[in-house]
Amino acid sequence: MKKTIILGMIICVPSISMAQWSLERCIDYAITHNIQLRQQENNTQLKELSLSTARNASLPDLSFGAQESFSFGRGLTADNTYTNKSTNSTALQLSTSVPLFTGMEIQNRIKQAKAELDAATEELEKARNDIRVEVAKYYMQAVYGHELTETARRQVGIDSLQTERLRQMLKAGKAAAADVARQEAALAQSRLTLTQTETDMRSAILSLRLLLELQDDKAFDIIMPKHDYDKIAGMTIPSAEFIYEQALTQRPEIKSGMIKLKSSEYNISIAKAALYPKLYLSGSLGTNYYKTSGIEMDGFGKQMKNNFNQGIGLSLSIPIFNRFQTRNNIRAARVEHLSQQLSMENTKKALYNEVQQVYLNTVSAKARYTSSLVARDSSEEAFRLTKAKYENGKASITEFNEAKNDMLKSESDLSRAKYEYIYQMALIDFYCGKDLKF
């Protein structure tokens, strides 16, 4: 209960002490701090390392080896007799090898690693898009909650003035006690509605705050967007076919699928590389030192110099038969390629369904907005006329409250329809490759 009260105080404090957050700021913050996105970024970095490893496979390797050995005991001498002796030897070698031809395996692995990095980058962008849409949805709910609360406050203000007016009229004997009681009940209901809308608004802001993973001590409130009703009504909805065509060229999930399809083609080429011979160039530098007890031999430095040796060679490996492993690897790579083709078609189908649903939702939202706009204008005019009749004693308090409630309900319905339509239009622009904003 204490936390609820504190939260209410934070949200109800004047905006001068609040940090005002726009939708763009919320999205940027979420993208920067979301844990899942940061994990996805780590995966992209791993793909970058894999690409570096694939590129470095064409470089020569270099290794250094050293060996020191000792032996003790009886051994055969040069005059064919046995005697106790000890020997020790030292060997040093520097060797290198470089691939000259591997059936284009290295080149195709580089292409595949680059494709996997590009696919991971697009998948990261898709994850960012998901966050953008989620933040926009919660932000819009918070905006709607703000506007609904303002409408409820207006209702409380109207009912408060009307209640006070009737009380004064009752004292003057110009109003019935029953009318005052009904108006006081209407005021109590208006205050209850305001309490509920404030609770819903706080809940929406809290949900947005939790999505952004904001720290508890960070002040937070949203900036209310401003929209012209005529401009909103004049917005044109593009065709579903146009939206889908644009989405096919812009959406990261489509780009990622196409890149993965290309990567699977490289995988077939990598498997086929095992059919070709492999040629390596190798080279080495080495020297050694040897000493036997009882025999006079050159010193360490002289032996190391005199025993210095160099070597160069070519290594050719020609595959003949490996128990059909290469054949099966090629077949498996082709099956994976076919699976990726099906996955690509499924991704396109899912995108088509999404676009159709967004288009239908937008058309419906526009129809609701247009109808709500007419209903709002009509209810405002009806309230104006009823209010004039009531003030002239030609309408009852019940008729006045009914007209007032109809007007305020139409305003609430218009707010909901307006923001739903704005959100759906923003989604259409987003599917067409534009920034998500409203």
Language model: regions and residue ranges:
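Membrane-embedded beta-strand positions in outer-membrane beta-barrel channels/transporters
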Residues: Q93-S95, Y139, Y244, G313-S315, ...
